[in-house]
Amino acid sequence: MATIKDVARLAGVSVATVSRVLNSSPKTSSESREAVKKAMDELKYHPNANARALSHQGNETLGIVVGDVSTPFFGIMVKAVDQVAYATGNFLLVGNSYHDAKRERKAIEQLLRHQCAGIVVHAMMLSDEELQHFMAHVPGMVMINRTVPGYESRCINLDNRFGAELATNHLIQQGHRSIAYLSSSYQIADAFERQQGYIDALTQHGIPVDERLIIQGTPDEIGGERAVVGLLNQGRKVTGIVCYNDPMAAGALSALSDNGIQVPTQISVIGFDDVLITNYLQPHLTTIRYPVIEMATQAARLAIALAHGEPAPDVTNLFIPT
């Protein structure tokens, strides 16, 4: 585990200079700042953001890393964390990663450098090993929608596989046998888990899995619309569609409407997440509820408590969608 002395030695500066760089002091030259940052990157040194934040009582901040704050799902998550931050006298800093490993890493590092008292992280592309390294150095780092081995007590996750199984079972119970699945094209854990949940439900009911009915698309309205167009172009008759999330379901409804297909009389559609958009769709969308507000609230409270060395509040480490 690298120390501040190791950084100073590699950068060719004093420990005091490294400390000034970490605290964004104006009394450092640009050459020193670059040398220190290069050494930190090479050594994978992550200063203990929690200890630094506690030494700056007037600068209490909470950080969150999300995929894309402009989407309804992540917008709800950020708002829930922000409400906890405000209630506890913290200011919220947000980092977007766009489901890219390099940007996830950079977002976490930037929040650490900004002396966050705790960090809630939604990161699907970084490896378990890299996240374990971060969590070992940052006691106030909490994962959401992912479980990192060895740090299960600091992870707030959802049973995505069960949720997709629940959605598929809902259509099967309505009598559907030819059911398509609109899958996320992002290579992330919950995309695989939800697709597997769909497969599980079909298998349990003796329905053959037709890979041609699993259509990938970006997890948004455009992706859902294009996926349904691709499905219709196959000429295969389906009576039900399970969607990776609600935005894809919204796009699916639009494409079906454009092609004169009535929902739910001709085809049934079910989403996943239960975000605000579902309240304004016509016809109304049946969806699986993702308790994102509860999960984000618990994650934020846990991060703050751990950052300050306080007893961890009671949390649910694995939520069950309904």
What do these predicted regions represent?
Residues 1-60:
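N-terminal helix-turn-helix DNA-binding module of bacterial transcription factors
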Residues 1-3, 41-79, 87-90, 98-99, ...:
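N-terminal helix-turn-helix/winged-helix DNA-binding helices
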Residues 35, 73-87, 163-170, 189-208, ...:
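Short, solvent-exposed amphipathic alpha-helices that sit
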Residues 91, 99, 117-166, 187, ...:
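Flexible loop/hinge segments that line or gate small-molecule binding clefts
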Residues 156-181, 196, 200, 221-230, ...:
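Hydrophobic alpha-helical segments within soluble ligand-binding/sensing domains
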Residues 167-205, 212, 312-322:
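An alpha-beta-alpha
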Residues 177-178, 209-213, 262-269:
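Short acidic capping loops at alpha-helix termini that bridge into adjacent secondary structure
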Residues 229-240, 244-322:
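Flexible loop/turn connectors
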